[in-house]
Amino acid sequence: AEPGRQGDTSAATAQAFGSGTLAIMQRLRVAVVGCSGTGSVVVEQLARTGIGTLILVDPDVVEHRNLNRIVNATEQDAELRTPKVEVMRRAIAAMGTGTKVETLATSLFRPEAIRAVSKADILFGCVDTVDARHLLCQIGAFYLLPYFDIGVKLEADGRGGVEQVCCSVHYIRPGGGSLLSRGVYSLDEVRAAGLLRSDPTYLADQVARGYLRGVQESRPAVISVNMLAASLAVNDLLARLHPYRLEGNESYAAQRVSLSHDLFDHEADGAACTVVGRGLGKGDVEPLLDQPEFSEPS
């Protein structure tokens, strides 16, 4: 940003939440994993709100089929197969807000991505596979990082109508509950998602034998619902930096919205997760996260 311009772009945030909160935000390093339908909106909001540095992780490129939901992506990006993280970098640079950007056009399941994300202060997960969501919970535990998990679910009723439209935001604090302990997924589902990524043939065999359930690989996505979920998550972050809710933040460990059923509820954290909690505060270990999959060449 040009001299003097960054202060101008941040003035509204300071007016709403105070100069002290803005100063904290400008020092924060926030990792956003997943830069598609929900992640691109989160990135847009964080950059314009005044976050100092964004670490962006996504292995995919822009395609025509997702132009309906990736903020700042263009038809030319789809033609050129521009990496999604580069679309985000370009957009943030054009904003002139002064937000620094680090990008990794690779899978979170690469050691270099885990190391980059571990250097953040806060994690945002905008991914739809349970193994990636579980991995983010583990990274948060090992490196004592708070994690905001965003989920969006649209289901058709098979008759041309809609069964449900809903979204959720989970705040996972180190040493507390996890997505696993809250019942968002099971370890069998994590295993199945991992096999889909690493050995889909073996997964198909296990499903055929009845040992594992299949994995739904894609869901419909609508930008308006993605934006609702992203805004809920970013506002949750703001509430934790500058408390503004009538109820304390401890009552908002999980927030759920159903547009189809006209519901909004929130709840406090439950018992600590004994599975994810095994790595609490371990930090850098060999192999990373105590998992041979993430062994690095010496």
Regions found by a protein language model. Give the residues of each.
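Glycine-rich adenosine-cofactor-binding loop
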Residues: 18-63
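Conserved acidic residues
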Residues: 105-107
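Glycine-rich phosphate-binding loop and adjoining beta1-alpha1-beta2 segment
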Residues: 56-96
